[in-house]
Each structure stands twice: as C-alpha cells, then as structure tokens.
Swiss-Prot record:
InterPro entries: UreD
Signal peptide: none
The protein, known as: Urease accessory protein UreD
One Pfam family in the UniProt entry: UreD
Keywords linked to the UniProt accession: Chaperone, Cytoplasm, Nickel insertion
Length: 276
C-alpha cells in the first residue's frame, strides 16, 4: 500500500523570534527547532522515517514563512526514489513567503535508483521583499555501488511563477542527453543553488553575489562544469555537473556561505546535522 504523507510548516515572527509550528499526516515530520544564530533564525530538520519512496508514494511538503521571519530547512537524509514497477512517485514541495520573509531550503540530495519512476516538484511563491535561497541536488543511480541508472524516468520541476521555471525529463534510455557534451556529458550528479527575490535586486547586489559565486567556483575542482548566472533581476542561479554527490554538495555549500555574506551579511552557520 502506498504511503501518502503531508507536512505543513508555518513560521511566524514573534517578539524578535522566529517560531515554527507544524501539522503532519503520515511518516513525515520535523525535529526540534534549533536557534544556533539566535532567536531570529529558526533551523529545522525534516525527517521521513521510511527512508525512501516506491511506486505510488507521495510526499507533500508545504512551508509558509510570515512577515519578517527567517527559517532554514534541511533534511536528515537523502530522498531515495527506489525502483518502481507501477505508479509513479511524487514529491511536491510548495514554499510561500510573506513580505520581508527569508527562507533557506537546503535538503540533502535526491537519489534516483535504477528503474525508478519519480517526479520532484518545487514551487515558490514570493511576496514583495521576500527572499529565498534554495538547493537541489540529484544523483542518477549508484554507479560506485555497481548500480548505474540504465532504466527508469525522473522528472524535475522548479518554478517561481512569473520569474523562473525549469523543467527536465531524464529518461535512462536517452543516451544523447546522458552522454552528450551538450547534456550531462556522462556525469551522474546535477545540482543547482538559486536565490529568488520577491522584488528586484539592485545591480550592485546581483553583481556582488555573482562575483562571490564565481570566485568560489574558480577555486574549486568542478570549475569546468559549474557556472553562475542571473536570468532576471530577481533570480540568481548556480548550476553544476559532478561525477558524484560529495563534490557537488561541497561547492553548493561554499557558494551558499558566500551568498549569505554578500546578500544578507550573515555568517555561514551551516545546519548542525551537516557535520554528522
């Protein structure tokens, strides 16, 4: 029987403190709120005890961040899309930010096992003055464990309505996409870090963030397969390809730290669970 799990997170600013409240149905919840940066920024960790998704499973994650609140959400482990012989798997995430809200959406990687049939959808709604930094890391198969991605299908959709939309369909039989230098060029990990704003970013802020990202990229081993751009005056995007997850995560976290400093004048302060 498929699992259908839902989680609703609501963040509000109360007396200079960001407070999290949540409701859940099924095996999806958050751990205790942490405040390593003080009361203004709330860190939460998503937990999905089954550890993976199979045919017909659905995860529905929704987070609402109120005016002036700042939330950081990560996950306790990778999202695992297992082999599926039947109905597709769907993970749907909807993030909504009120005026002046900030959110860091920083889940660990999604692992697409051989013969999976999965869709991962992320939608962000940003009010004027709201800002969100988000990460997406996808690994195709487990080639180092002798389980390459040679069958299956994965659909990836990321959207900030009216500003930016990315939609990709990866079919394991599409060798032109997987092997071509104009596609994934044989890499089994693709990742992006994005910064979206509900109001236009000044040219100075965009230039500062892009310069910071490019300096990190130039000093990294993945510099030939990574790049940072600004498709419009409300969005910044870092994209990269990697042979495996670890170097991709390393680069994303370094750029995230650089963007925190350049855009928000904040220290890196990685979630504690990343050190485990």
């Amino acid at each position: 029987m498929p699992w259908h799990a839902r989680l609703q997170l609501n963040y509000t600013r109360e007396h200079a403190r960001t407070v999290a409240r949540f409701e859940h149905h099924g095996p999806l919840r958050v751990l205790q709120s942490l405040y390593p940066e003080g009361g203004g920024i709330c860190h939460n960790v998503l937990v999905h005890p089954p550890g993976g998704l199979v045919g017909g499973d659905q995860l529905d994650i929704r987070a609402s961040v109120g005016p002036g609140a700042h939330a950081l959400i990560t996950s306790a482990g990778a999202t695992r899309f297992y082999r599926s012989m039947g109905a597709p798997v769907l993970q749907r995430t909807c993030l909504s930010l009120a005026p002046g809200a900030r959110l860091e959406w920083l889940p660990l990687e999604a692992l697409c096992y051989n013969a999976c049939n999965a869709e991962n959808r992320l939608t962000l709604t940003l009010a004027p003055g709201a800002e969100c930094m988000g990460a997406d890391v996808t690994a195709l198969g487990l080639p180092h464990a002798g389980q390459p991605f040679v069958a299956g299908r994965f659909v990836q959709h990321i959207e900030i309505p009216g500003l930016w939309r990315e939609h990709g369909v990866i079919d394991a039989t599409d060798q032109r996409l997987l092997r071509s230098p104009l596609g994934l060029a044989g890499h089994c990990c693709m990742a992006s870090l994005f910064f979206g704003a509900g109001s236009a970013l000044s040219q100075a802020r965009r230039d500062s963030a892009l310069d910071a990202a490019r300096a990190v990229i130039d000093a990294h081993a993945l510099k030939t397969t990574a790049g940072a751009t600004s498709p419009c005056d409300q969005v910044l995007v870092l994209r990269l390809l990697a042979p495996q997850v670890e170097p991709a995560m390393q680069l994303l976290r370094q750029v995230r730290a650089a963007w925190r400093a350049a855009l928000w004048q904040l220290d890196a302060e990685p979630p504690r669970i990343w050190a485990m």
